[in-house]
Amino acid sequence: MSVIKEYRTASEVVGPLMIVEQVNNVSYNELVEIQLHNGEIRRGQVLEIHEDKAMVQLFEGSSGINLEKSKIRFAGHALELAVSEDMVGRIFNGMGKPIDGGPDLIPEKYLDIDGQAINPVSRDYPDEFIQTGISSIDHLNTLVRGQKLPVFSGSGLPHNELAAQIARQATVLNSDENFAVVFAAMGITFEEAEFFMEELRKTGAIDRSVLFMNLANDPAIERIATPRIALTAAEYLAFEKDMHVLVIMTDMTNYCEALREVSAARREVPGRRGYPGYLYTNLSTLYERAGRLVGKKGSVTQIPILTMPEDDITHPIPDLTGYITEGQIILSHELYNQGYRPPINVLSSLSRLKDKGSGEGKTRGDHAPTMNQLFAAYAQGKKVEELAVVLGESALSDVDKLYVRFTKRFEEEYINQGFYKNRNIEDTLNLGWELLSILPRTELKRIKDDLLDKYLPLVEV
């Protein structure tokens, strides 16, 4: 049994960082406890070691710390999360402590929040469909178990409502399999936290959810730990309890701002727009924890949500996120201003694994052909609308006018399904056929004749 040493050699506090001198046998990422002069305990983590000095990152902030009277203890292990199946249905703060008034967890074990590196050879390829109940995602940008598919939003757009809708509605089609949602919120307001909790409570979805809430008035440094704690809970449920877990993380922009704050306090050389040069590497340690493992029944699927500063998709946060993840769902100010909910820009959005989770036995045999045809028809319809603005509607051919009609109905009925309508994949595919039947059969060149014969007669415009 190792002896825990106590130090009173704190020499400096700069923002969220503390320097402790004359330390030995201290390791990187080690958990630290700081006992203040009034008996209060705060936690931190070793960020850097140089000779006999350790730099400690404080999770609860540095206000009120008296350097001379503070006692520092190094725990001998990294920050760990107490995990148990009883986590499901509970609400925790950003550090994993219950805040729902329920009893403390009786932990089955303690897990390092940084997780374990996954050998690429042991990864299984994502190829099974997850139904979100949202047509623009399920049909056109299909989400697959084990995928990481971010949502790129902008200021004033309803990404919180979309996140809540996915958390309420997401499911796997095989009802025999256990499904859970892990929700990690970083830097959200009290009103937003109440919105998420109430939305899940009133639909009963909270019974299959685990919520981790880091509020805007919580220490920014806590935001660095929150997504790691949430992913640790997800990995436990997926790979030890054989559950299919969907992890929703919002807002990743707040997480990156916390990284920038720590980097500035460490006086590191800034990278693009003041963010640390290791932002890409740091984000990858989160996003790459999604996936499936050979020999394991469970899976971890991620939907990170971020707000693009100034709606700039070339900003470092969405730019680097796009490199690591497998596509993106982009929300549109134009569609939002027209009253469409959710305002998903389907032409700019992409799921790189959509072909792996669709087809006979997963969704339906007409999934991919109708998806391609809807994309083509909608893109053509938008071109015709632009042409009509320049030349006038009188210059449009009869087929062009049908494309305009299709585009209008596609946006009003398909995209604009609302935040409280849950469409299963069958209803979505049937709606797609109904809209495609507006166009002449000769225009449906991306669908084979046997599928046209099977499905087109079944719909009426």
Swiss-Prot record:
NCBIfam families: PRK04196.1. Coiled coil: none annotated. InterPro entries: ATP-synt_VA_C (IPR055190), ATPase_F1/V1/A1_a/bsu_N (IPR004100), ATPase_F1/V1/A1_a/bsu_nucl-bd (IPR000194), P-loop_NTPase (IPR027417), V-ATPase_su_B/beta (IPR022879). It holds the Pfam family ATP-synt_VA_C. It comes from Streptococcus pneumoniae (strain CGSP14). Produces ATP from ADP in the presence of a proton gradient across the membrane. The V-type beta chain is a regulatory subunit. It comes from the Bacteria. HAMAP family: ATP_synth_B_arch. GO terms for biological process: proton motive force-driven plasma membrane ATP synthesis. This is V-type ATP synthase beta chain. Gene3D superfamilies: 3.40.50.12240. Keywords: ATP synthesis, Hydrogen ion transport, Ion transport, Transport. PANTHER family: V-TYPE PROTON ATPASE SUBUNIT B (PTHR43389:SF4). The lineage of its organism: Bacteria, Bacillati, Bacillota, Bacilli, Lactobacillales. Belongs to the ATPase alpha/beta chains family. One of its GO terms (molecular function) is proton-transporting ATP synthase activity, rotational mechanism.
